[in-house]
Design a protein with these regions (language model features):
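Extracytosolic ligand-binding ectodomains
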Residues: 2, 9, 22-388
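Sec-dependent signal peptide hydrophobic core
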Residues: 5-15
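N-terminal signal peptide c-region/cleavage motif recognized by signal peptidases
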Residues: 17-19
Length: 388
């Protein structure tokens, strides 16, 4: 074969490789562009800020160590204000203008559901969203990857156990009137079937509500002694706080959405007794093991405040991405990344998160979950993992 023919073949191969790289948006020779949508100025801004900080910490660590196969991460974060309409606009900007490779740790159920069609149209992965809705892995889509057992399963699994332990006469529900709250409601209804019970009363509130007097009054009037909460931060605090003022003290049972130190920090002693499902444990620094204290000190040095469990969610999302992208190798395309995820196992971490396992048919990492309760102003784990 002539030298000129060798040269032509080499040139053609280089063009082909360049074309493949060019077709994978968000990936260049020295950079990977990731996008995230958080609530930075709405009702869940406390969560969104923490998730963002956790992501930034892990991104900085990775970049300081040379990146992923020689590529640094550039993280772009947009504010949804916890509004699905804003989430669509943010997704359009990140996907179509900023050309992100993947959407990572997007906060909110309705917000993810609104944004995913924009992403999937451009072959952009939805990676480790910060919501436990089933829609994060159902119906199956090759670009969906979730790591939190769904709200539906959390309530369906633990509510019968709560009933058997507390022996309530009337189980009721207060829930946010959107996809998140409906998942909690469905889980409660299904879980009660296992103990031959039904909800005696149920009532909803609009996203962003601040007054829960009428909802609590309905619970009290129906003599509800176990109340399932499809609530997040201020709705949880508002509901329980209102109940305490009325001298109404049922057992309150929430989901992982209410598992945050903000509940007892902002709600005070009235929040004692609240149960919530969870996986990753909140890092209380005065009782944490040395690896967590070391990590928390790095966090505090960078942001001048203590981390919380949502900081961990953000940190872990980037860490899992880095594991998968690193194993994918230098030829980082969406298809190659998905193939890596199809066989990825992530071991349990220093925060007590369960092992995650993915496969070509399995787009959720784990169904494992456990239960915590606020006791003496802090969350205490009160059950072992189930569904492992």
């Amino acid at each position: 074969m002539s030298t000129s023919r060798h040269t032509l073949i080499a040139f053609a191969l280089s063009l082909s490789a360049g074309a493949v790289l060019a077709q994978t948006q968000g990936v260049s020779k020295d950079e990977i562009v990731l996008g995230s949508i958080q609530d930075l100025s709405g009702p869940l801004a406390g969560f969104g800020k923490s998730v963002r900080q956790g992501m930034v910490l892990r991104v900085d660590e990775i970049n300081e160590q040379g990146g992923i196969n020689g590529r640094k991460i550039r993280l772009l974060v947009e504010d949804s204000k916890y509004d699905p309409r804003n989430a669509v606009l943010a997704a359009q900007k990140l996907v179509n203008q900023e050309k992100i490779f993947a959407m990572i740790a997007h906060l909110g159920t309705a917000q993810n559901m609104a944004a995913m069609p924009v992403q999937f149209q451009k072959n952009v992965v939805n990676f480790m969203p910060v919501t436990a809705a089933r829609e994060m892995y159902e119906p199956f889509h090759k670009l969906k990857f979730a790591n939190i057992g769904p709200y539906y399963e959390q309530v369906r699994t633990f509510l019968p156990r709560m009933v058997q332990e507390k022996k309530p006469k009337a189980v009721c529900a207060i829930y946010q009137d959107d996809e998140f709250g409906l998942e909690v409601l469905r889980g409660a209804e299904e879980g009660l079937k296992a103990v031959n019970m039904t909800l005696v009363e149920k009532t909803s509130f609009k996203r962003g509500a601040t007054d829960f007097a009428s909802q609590v009054a309905r619970m009290k009037a129906a003599n509800c002694d176990l109340v399932v909460l499809g609530t997040i931060i201020r709705e949880t605090i508002g509901t329980i706080g209102t109940a305490r003022k009325l001298d109404y003290n049922p057992t309150f049972f929430g989901t992982q959405a209410a598992y945050t130190d903000l509940i007892h920090k902002l709600g005070g002693p009235a929040m004692n007794g609240l149960y919530a499902t969870m996986t990753t444990q909140h890092p209380y620094l005065d009782e944490a093991a040395q690896p967590i204290r070391f990590w928390a000190n790095k966090f505090k040095t960078k942001f001048n405040e203590d981390p919380n469990v949502f900081s961990v969610y953000g940190y872990n999302a980037i860490d899992i991405f880095a594991r998968a992208a690193g194993r994918t190798g230098a030829n980082l395309t969406t298809d190659n990344f998905v193939k890596t995820m199809d066989s990825l196992t992530v071991p349990s971490d220093i925060f007590g998160s369960p092992e995650l396992r993915f496969s070509p048919q399995r787009r959720y990492g784990s169904m494992a979950m456990r239960l915590s309760q606020i006791q003496d102003g802090r969350w205490k784990v009160v059950s072992d993992y189930v569904n492992q």
